[in-house]
């Protein structure tokens, strides 16, 4: 069983010391989603929401969230991120409900991974879409948020299998 690395000998929280770790390229990809009704789907697709361009605003929120992860997740190291990207794709197969899939990719060259930054970006992106469209319908559903893949670092690569 793996030990918790964020607990010191007295049982208190600590931030892990990464001083001796090797600098490597690290990338993480995360996923989230939000399911909306037809009215919101059309507003987002046609850019007619009264608050502005929902997807552009959500993309910026996701990028800002990744950059600020260490300020909201207590044991995360502040990292010099080298790339952040947010992609959207619609799933229209369950109309009149529409699911907007969110994929975030975060990269760095450093001593610790960017999984939390990618997950935070995906979450904040979904939350921003909810915030910008909640006046139309508060019944939206933010879906599962999970790590799709990660590369680099001592623990090696990870790729989520479809049955995970």
Curated annotation (Swiss-Prot):
Primary enzyme class: lyase
Chain positions recorded as substrate binding sites: 75-77, 116-117
Name of the protein: Cyclic pyranopterin monophosphate synthase
Function according to Swiss-Prot or TrEMBL: Catalyzes the conversion of (8S)-3',8-cyclo-7,8-dihydroguanosine 5'-triphosphate to cyclic pyranopterin monophosphate (cPMP).
Source species of the chain: Staphylococcus aureus (strain MSSA476)
Pfam families: MoaC
Statement: the UniProt record of this protein carries the keyword Acetylation: no
Keyword Chloroplast: no
Enzyme Commission numbers on file: 4.6.1.17
GO MF, any single term: cyclic pyranopterin monophosphate synthase activity
């Amino acid at each position: 069983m793996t030990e918790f690395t964020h607990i010191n000998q007295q049982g208190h929280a600590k931030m892990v010391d990464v001083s001796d770790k090797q600098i490597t390229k690290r990338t993480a990809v995360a996923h989230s989603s939000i399911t909306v009704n037809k009215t919101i789907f059309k507003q987002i697709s046609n850019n007619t929401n009264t608050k502005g361009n929902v997807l552009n605003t959500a993309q910026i929120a996701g990028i800002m969230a990744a950059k600020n992860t260490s300020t909201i997740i207590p044991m995360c190291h502040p990292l010099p991120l080298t790339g952040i990207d947010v992609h959207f794709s619609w799933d229209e197969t369950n109309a009149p409900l529409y699911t907007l899939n969110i994929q975030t990719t975060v990269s760095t060259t450093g001593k610790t991974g960017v999984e939390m930054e990618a997950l935070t970006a995906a979450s904040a992106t979904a939350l921003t879409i909810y915030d910008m469209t909640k006046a139309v319908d508060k019944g939206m559903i933010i879906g599962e948020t999970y790590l799709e893949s990660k590369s680099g670092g001592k623990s090696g690569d990870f790729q989520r299998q479809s049955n995970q």
